[in-house]
Amino acid sequence: MQFKNVALAASVAALSATASAEGYTPGEPWSTLTPTGSISCGAAEYTTTFGIAVQAITSSKAKRDVISQIGDGQVQATSAATAQATDSQAQATTTATPTSSEKISSSASKTSTNATSSSCATPSLKDSSCKNSGTLELTLKDGVLTDAKGRIGSIVANRQFQFDGPPPQAGAIYAAGWSITEDGYLALGDSDVFYQCLSGNFYNLYDQNVAEQCSAIHLEAVSLVDC
């Protein structure tokens, strides 16, 4: 396993839970809020805790640090691993220098994951990252993504990726249908492409390109270790 020591950051950003004409209505079942498609050989279960790191979709495969999370569930992408803001949004800062990264390899081992087909290789997380109190720590079960506080990973009404509840916030579009690809990327439905959109000195994460300052990324699943 290749070890990468990455910086983690967290910042506070608020997002109101407003109802939407489409999406989740409080009191209704939310586990059926899934995209219509699914990615080939995506593993809908990974019970070992993992983090996610932003990897730019470029020829050099430059990767940021792991994503962090602030106290209310916001996910933040720094130039290192992903953090989580206190209000549940996923965000990333812009200060760290991107580092090159090898593509995550696949493995036949099935100790911690459950692939959708017996003919599919199970994802093996090749990269590791140091974790701290702001690191976004995840588990995946039956296509539902949860953080260390048990909140549900969802795409909310403005297409932003964040954690709430359970249940997810009113108007949420997707709250299930997550998987990890054979290459080790987080996927939602049939897509493993997400978007980071610059907001001040950090990036918010979305499932669609919502503005000119957004760029396409992969979210690489990484092992988390105490350093």
Curated annotation (Swiss-Prot):
Database matches in PROSITE patterns: PIR_REPEAT_1 (PS00929), PIR_REPEAT_2 (PS50256)
UniProt site positions, description: Covalent attachment to cell wall glycan: Q74
InterPro entries, A to Z: PIR1-like_C (IPR054508), Yeast_CWMannoprotein_PIR (IPR051153), Yeast_PIR_rpt (IPR000420)
Annotated glycan sites: S68, T78, S105, S106, S107, S109, T111, S112, T113, N114, T116, S117, S118
Residues making up the signal peptide according to the UniProt record: 1-21
Mutagenesis / variant outcome for changing C197S: Results in the incorporation of KEX2-unprocessed precursor protein into the cell wall
Segments of skewed composition (Low complexity): 83-124
Post-translational note: Covalently linked to beta-1,3-glucan of the inner cell wall layer via an alkali-sensitive ester linkage between the gamma-carboxyl group of glutamic acid, arising from Gln-74 within the PIR1/2/3 repeat, and hydroxyl groups of glucoses of beta-1,3-glucan chains.
One example GO MF annotation: structural constituent of cell wall
GO biological process assignments: fungal-type cell wall organization
Compartment annotation: Secreted, Cell wall
Mutagenesis / variant outcome for changing D65N: Does not affect cell wall incorporation
One Pfam family hit: PIR
Additional comment: Present with 12500 molecules/cell in log phase SD medium.
Name used for this protein in its record: Cell wall mannoprotein CIS3
Organism, as annotated: Saccharomyces cerevisiae (strain ATCC 204508 / S288c) (Baker's yeast)
